A protein has these predicted regions:
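Cationic, low-complexity basic patches in intrinsically disordered or flexible, solvent-exposed regions
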Residues: 199
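Alpha-helix C-terminal capping segments
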Residues: 2-10, 31
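Short hydrophobic/aromatic-enriched beta-strand-loop microsegments
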Residues: 10-17
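A charged alpha-helical hairpin associated with nucleic-acid processing machineries
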Residues: 19-35, 39-188, 192, 196
């Protein structure tokens, strides 16, 4: 956070010692419409981001995820590449739903038909979480675009979502991000636009 302030990202803060909560998300909602997540680029940081995304969404705050690799955190990134490159990474932040999709991909052997099938089943489960039909259809198209080499089509994915909706998805099958320990650090950044906020660690 200090490093960010020093290079001009002056609306930065950190929860320091606790994971993001619904209370934090409600507070953020008072000041911004969008949050950028900049957790550490290691596995713990990924889990923290996955946990934060639905909490923010529930509070009505949209989110995107910033890729800091090959550096671990904003401090390392800024020291190595500077504020201008850091700003570019912020601008390239990934939509949080698609971030969840790409992280889910890691769990399946995508070189095998069975792995691909299970992955798209997971995608369908996540799509069912979206109550707005237009939003759901837009993400279906985005998934198909990103994974067109796997042979998935908009029609096929819509059918999979529809089939799950008809029979209902058991609670134990729904996606639940792994919990983040209480020691996970969270940081917040607010860029110049008053309607956009960003989260880092």
């Amino acid at each position: 956070v200090i490093s960010m302030h020093q290079v001009g990202f002056t609306n930065a803060g950190a929860s320091l010692g606790t994971a993001l909560t619904s209370g934090h998300a409600s507070l953020l909602k008072r000041y911004t419409q969008e949050v950028l997540l900049l957790y550490d680029s290691d596995d713990a940081g990924v889990r923290a981001a996955l946990r934060a995304i639905p909490i923010l969404r529930e509070a009505g705050v949209s989110s995107r995820v910033v890729n800091l690799k090959p550096h671990k955190d904003p401090d390392e990134f800024i020291k190595a590449l500077g504020a201008e490159e850091f700003e570019k990474r912020l601008e390239q932040a990934m939509d949080s739903f698609m971030f969840r999709v790409h992280m889910a991909e890691r769990e399946f052997p995508m070189e095998e038909p069975q792995g691909q099938n299970r992955f798209f089943e997971r995608c369908a489960q996540m799509l069912l979480e979206l109550s707005d039909e237009l939003e759901r259809n837009l993400y279906i198209e985005a998934i198909v675009k990103d994974y067109r080499n796997s042979g998935i089509s908009v029609e096929n994915l819509k059918k999979r979502v529809g089939a799950l909706a008809m029979k209902g998805t058991p609670a134990e099958q729904r996606i639940q991000p792994k919990p983040v320990g209480a020691g996970q650090q969270l940081s917040l950044i607010h860029i110049s636009e008053p309607t956009r906020l960003q989260l880092i660690s």
